[in-house]
Amino acid sequence: MNMLTALLINITLSLCLITIAFWLPQLNMYTEKASPYECGFDPMSSARLPFSMKFFLVAITFLLFDLEIALLLPLPWAMQINNIKVMMLTSFILVSVLALGLAYEWMQKGLEWTE
């Protein structure tokens, strides 16, 4: 019974805090809350603004190459393993696939900003 009492107290306290956190910011709307935050976007307007596909492609390319660096960074420590041929083949395949993806995006003019 003691465990049930503690559970009920925790649930009640959590619900009270969630309710207070939800209603408290809506009580005092002053100009600082309504002004644009560091990014310059109006916080009271719709968040569904049109997004440039060029920026999206550059962001995806950045993420892919960032992932490549994260995967290739442990290679110096992997050199100490016994089966170095498999490790080198895997890293070569990874770099080749990413280079082919970059070449494809370049050929499709996904990196051109003049269009």
Curated annotation (Swiss-Prot):
One of its GO terms (molecular function) is NADH dehydrogenase (ubiquinone) activity. Its main location: mitochondrion. The keyword Zinc does not apply. Core subunit of respiratory chain NADH dehydrogenase (Complex I) which is composed of 45 different subunits. Interacts with TMEM186. Interacts with TMEM242. GO terms for cellular component: mitochondrial inner membrane; NADH dehydrogenase complex. The keyword Lyase does not apply. It catalyses: a ubiquinone + NADH + 5 H(+)(in) = a ubiquinol + NAD(+) + 4 H(+)(out). It is found in: Mitochondrion inner membrane. The chain crosses the membrane at residues 4-24, 55-75, 86-106. Pfam families: Oxidored_q4. This is NADH-ubiquinone oxidoreductase chain 3. It comes from Isthmomys pirrensis.
